[in-house]
Amino acid sequence: MAELIIVDFQNISIFILLCLFSFLCYALFFKKPKGFDLPPSPPSLPIIGHLHHLLSSSLPHKSFQKLSFKYGPLLHLRIFNFPMVLVSSASMAYEVFRTNDVNVSYRFVPVNKDSLVFGSSGFVTAPYGDYWKFMKKLISTKLLRPHALELSKGNRAEELRRFCLDLQGKARKKESVEIGKVALKLTNNIICRMSMGRSCSEKNGVAERARELVNKSFALSVKLFFSNMFRKDIMGVSREFDEFLERILVEHEENLEGDQDRDMIDHLLEAYRNEEAEYKITRKQIKSLIVEIFLGGTDSSAQTIQWTMAEILNNPGVLEKLRAEIDSVVGGKRLIQESDLPNLPYLQAVVKEGLRLHPSAPVLLRVFGESCEVKEFYVPEKTTLVVNLYAVNRDPDSWEDPDMFKPERFLVSSISGDEEKIREQAVKYVTFGGGRRTCPAVKLAHIFMETAIGAMVQCFDWRIKGEKVYMEEAVSGLSLKMAHPLKCTPVVRFDPFSF
């Protein structure tokens, strides 16, 4: 009996020592400044933390939204041993980017660093630093500057014309089309011509090959969180992209063009050859950026076009008003063009409302580079920042009837021309990221979406099965998609090519 008591005492002593040791480790490595508390946190479970809260829906943004409705717009969560801060309101998102813009300009380090697809050589995945700053400047002052967009306007007009002619062919055959697919072909062809210029055409197969590789990459995005398990697949697509883009680079180097015909690759190669550049970029970084331009500029715009067309078809009043605006501005003898867009405020409002309700990436992920304070709460370094853009853009404290499709909310007349209200709306409207890492191609994306939707509304009536388009959501990788792709049959309403 005495021996058992001694053994029990020893076990208790060991247990107490382990508890003390654990407490000391926590105090040393996870201590926070005096007077600071972590953001509020829902009830958690041992080991898994708050994982069970995220299993309420197959859609992560919906699970996060449900949590924020119940516990508040700023939450501290833990998934196993990974800490995160969840932001779910416009005011809280504004506060984070206002006070910690640089600190939250960091992203996750990709597992497959060597890959051109989702790797670490690109601009989007690059850590905040000299390379990222140099590329941001190059994109803003060379690749997407207003003069460059003006020079490439003719290519975009050609592709829009081809897009409408293809739809006319479907209409004559009374064939249905999948809006997402035809929109993806349009955006892919435009990006191809803007980035590769003379190397890209339907005839030489370059545009088709680019589409094929983009589709393979999107298929891999579903496996992104298990990239160690699918490294072979990811690296396989990366090698295909590398071989494809190397041929394009060599072709550009062998056939240098004048300033009038320069495309994105020409500008990137110029920076690559410049020995006095602020930062010396590599061929791999050029290829990674082109891959990111294709992945970021094609599917996201195509998905928004699809979602917005679905909303338009479900709201006949919006369709009628939008069509009347286009007819009055464009007239009855030509196709809508980019120069019309500033005179089409309702079309702009329709696209903004589509983006508000259906952001292509519903959840924004960043990393706090250093410990900091957010609304008097302490956030440790290396904590993951999760901004639920879906919830932010449907925040009932910021938007009237937040779940309804009401483009009028974006018309200046609807907010009485009050500059303060206009500024407030800009703060709460977050669709292309936030802070200094906001997408630099916002203007180009709006051109894609507004001209495509404008042309489809101007030139065609659309027949759907049933009375309404089914709007169920699905998530593929980090993208918000329609669970049931929008299929409808075009009927020619106006032929702009008959004059």
UniProtKB/Swiss-Prot annotation:
The chain crosses the membrane at residues 4-24. It is a single-pass membrane protein. PROSITE patterns: CYTOCHROME_P450 (PS00086). The keyword Metal-binding applies. Keywords: Heme, Iron, Membrane, Metal-binding, Monooxygenase, Oxidoreductase, Transmembrane, Transmembrane helix. Its cofactor is heme. It is an enzyme of class 1 (oxidoreductase). It is found in: Membrane. Belongs to the cytochrome P450 family. This is Cytochrome P450 705A12.
